[in-house]
Design a protein with these regions (language model features):
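Structural motif
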Residues: 31-35, 67-70, 98-100, 108, ...
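Short glycine-rich anion-binding loops that position phosphate/pyrophosphate groups of nucleotides
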Residues: 42, 105-108
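Ligand-binding clefts of soluble mixed alpha/beta catalytic domains
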Residues: 94-96, 102, 110-113, 122-124
Length: 124
């Protein structure tokens, strides 16, 4: 899913995007572990945006029970096993996520550009 296509996706759209991105990743040999990203990890923060990502993750889990999904997660909890052990030790995704669902265009584009610059990779 391209975060520039859905500028402010709804919870339902985010759930569908998670499935579509995971299926696409499988074509590239990726065993998807999906993290719905937020400024909160499993209720550590409060707000409308947190609720949106938590609800979207719950919808995706309900619709696609075979897909490993967690949310809402902060990026560090999503990718760092050390942080995940502290923030969400019972998660099957935290600390090993490889498929990221961003809440909107601001978060998605900025994070992709950040990763591109730091890694030297080109992201189309």
């Amino acid at each position: 899913g391209d975060c520039a296509i859905n500028l402010k996706p709804t919870e339902d759209q985010l759930a569908e995007i998670a499935w579509e991105v995971a299926e696409c990743g499988k074509h590239f040999g990726i065993d998807p572990k999906v993290a719905f990203l937020s400024y909160s990890t499993l209720g550590s923060g409060k707000g409308e945006d947190v609720d949106k990502m938590r609800n979207a993750a719950a919808k995706a889990k309900e619709l696609y029970p075979s897909l490993p999904i967690e949310g809402e997660l902060q990026f560090d909890a999503a990718v760092s096993p050390r942080v995940a052990r502290t923030k969400c030790p019972n998660s099957e995704v935290a600390g090993q996520a490889n498929t990221f669902i961003f809440p909107d265009i601001n978060a998605g584009v900025e994070d992709c550009l950040y990763a591109s610059v730091l890694s030297g990779a080109w992201i189309c």
